[in-house]
Amino acid sequence: MSDAYLALETGDVVEATARAPGMARGELVFTTAYTGYEESLTDPSYEAQVLTFAYPLIGNYGVRPERTESDRVHPSAVVARELTDDVADWLRTEGVPAVDGIDTRDLVLDIRDGGAMQVGIAAGPDASPATARAQLADCPRLSARTEIGAHVSVDTAETHGNGDTTVALVDCGAKRSIIDAFVARGATVHRLPYDATPADIAAVDPDLLFISNGPGDPANFDAAEHLVDEYIGTVPIAGICLGQQIVARALGGDTEKMDFGHRGVNQPVLDHDSGRVVMTTQNHGYTVADPGDLTVTQVNVNDGTPEALDSAPLDVLTRQYHPEANPGPHDTRGFFDDVLAMADASYTPATAD
């Protein structure tokens, strides 16, 4: 083990222990999830971010490839109070810097009180406060990463499943479990690149246009926004997380960056129609500020931000949280049944996962 340093945007430099060497920079964020570290670390929505785990011990049930949400680790670096050797070895193999041995409660409070901030990390034998500060100096804002979609999307189209309902899934950084949720309910999913064209959508003749989750600023996903504008009123449209934000922007709404976002597996959401509160998995740093032509049907109990946007006349259903969970509670997996029913009135929902 060797030295590591975190240079914060506040001007502070925090000393830590290097568990996987390297230099990194990104937006410093935290998750309050106490399980599901395999899924979180492979969630494309964490691209270009430095992920801090609020829970003090990460790795106490090993690393299982079958639990991953993509083919690689996506955070630029990982920060924890304590990482097990299994997780540290995995991150080292992936080439992702990792540090521990610090009180992450202090970092979480800094982010909560001051908002998400940029950070530079230096870990390993050549690390110093100066090298960490150099990483910070070169760190672009998340909104400036205009090509982030290219780093998390498929390059060419893929097909999953062989069901009766056809879903055109625009991959802006999709989690594997979202695709699995559709396939388990009898759908054929055409996974298309983030910059898919209207012609690409037309080629698969979908019953449903789905905009996936993903990282970064929704304003940087013009191609997906154009698809919504092109197909609204013609094909039912759904989206999750970043997808909700993109759909709202396409339909006259707007988005904004949050102070520190929602990242965890216990975010309470209130449904206006039923009065029911459900626990949800969330991972986002932007939110819908103006829903445009859509109606807000669910809100976050903690801060009132929109968690669901619907329009029966336009055949639109979106969710800011992750109904597929992985990790997290399964309270809202019925969303996939709802959107498939919207796409095909004759569709019979499969048994819930």
UniProtKB/Swiss-Prot annotation:
Enzyme class: ligase
Alphabetical list of CDD domains matching this protein: GATase1_CPSase
Coiled-coil annotated spans: none
EC number in record: 6.3.5.5
Active site, per annotation: 241, 322, 324
Catalytic activity: hydrogencarbonate + L-glutamine + 2 ATP + H2O = carbamoyl phosphate + L-glutamate + 2 ADP + phosphate + 2 H(+)
GO biological process terms on file: 'de novo' pyrimidine nucleobase biosynthetic process; 'de novo' UMP biosynthetic process; glutamine metabolic process; L-arginine biosynthetic process
Gene Ontology CC entries for this record: carbamoyl-phosphate synthase complex; cytoplasm
Entry keywords, A to Z: Amino-acid biosynthesis, Arginine biosynthesis, ATP-binding, Glutamine amidotransferase, Ligase, Nucleotide-binding, Pyrimidine biosynthesis
Region listing for CPSase, in residue ranges: 1-166
Matches recorded under SMART domains: CPSase_sm_chain (SM01097)
GO-annotated molecular function: ATP binding; carbamoyl-phosphate synthase (glutamine-hydrolyzing) activity; glutaminase activity
Domain Glutamine amidotransferase type-1, chain residue ranges per copy: 166-349
Pathway: Amino-acid biosynthesis; L-arginine biosynthesis; carbamoyl phosphate from bicarbonate: step 1/1; Pyrimidine metabolism; UMP biosynthesis via de novo pathway; (S)-dihydroorotate from bicarbonate: step 1/3
Binding site for L-glutamine: 45, 214, 216, 242, 245, 283, 285-286
Summary of subunit composition and partner proteins: Composed of two chains; the small (or glutamine) chain promotes the hydrolysis of glutamine to ammonia, which is used by the large (or ammonia) chain to synthesize carbamoyl phosphate. Tetramer of heterodimers (alpha,beta)4.
Family recorded in the similarity comment: Belongs to the CarA family.
Function: Small subunit of the glutamine-dependent carbamoyl phosphate synthetase (CPSase). CPSase catalyzes the formation of carbamoyl phosphate from the ammonia moiety of glutamine, carbonate, and phosphate donated by ATP, constituting the first step of 2 biosynthetic pathways, one leading to arginine and/or urea and the other to pyrimidine nucleotides. The small subunit (glutamine amidotransferase) binds and cleaves glutamine to supply the large subunit with the substrate ammonia.
Protein name: Carbamoyl phosphate synthase small chain
Organism: Halobacterium salinarum (strain ATCC 700922 / JCM 11081 / NRC-1) (Halobacterium halobium)
Organism ancestry: Archaea, Methanobacteriati, Methanobacteriota, Stenosarchaea group, Halobacteria
This protein's encoding gene: carA
